[in-house]
Amino acid sequence: FIFVAPETDSKTSRAVIETPVLILNVIGVKNYEEGVAAAVQMADSGVKAIELCAGFGNEGIAMVSKAVKGKACVGAVRFDHHPGFDFKSGDELFQ
């Protein structure tokens, strides 16, 4: 899972949750560029499914999907206008 939020440090905003069924990697990023880099890193390490938070707008989802095409499936939680970001799209804030 990758979330995007202002002032997020992608080196320290990380967690791993292990269950008997799956391992959930959580990475926070401050913009789409870091989101793409995190997704590529995850896919290269063998992660097969990446879910993006609602902060990723349509353009951000497309950027990540293109970057990991053929290596990982990409899904997304969706808000057209995110309530946590003053009802703006991530496409307005994080490119």
What is the predicted role of each segment?
Residues 1, 25-27, 51-52, 74-76:
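Hydrophobic faces of well-ordered beta-strands that scaffold small-molecule active sites
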Residues 1-9:
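N-terminal basic/disordered segments at the start of proteins
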Residues 8-9, 14-17, 27, 62:
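Long, charge-rich, low-complexity intrinsically disordered regions
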Residues 19-33:
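Active-site mouth loops of central-metabolism enzymes
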Residues 36-39, 45-56:
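Amphipathic, hydrophobic secondary-structure cores in small proteins
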Residues 41-42, 64:
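Generic structural signal for hydrophobic
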Residues 58-82:
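Alpha-helix-loop-beta-strand connector modules within alpha/beta enzyme cores
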Residues 82-88:
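Short, charged, surface-exposed secondary-structure boundary motifs
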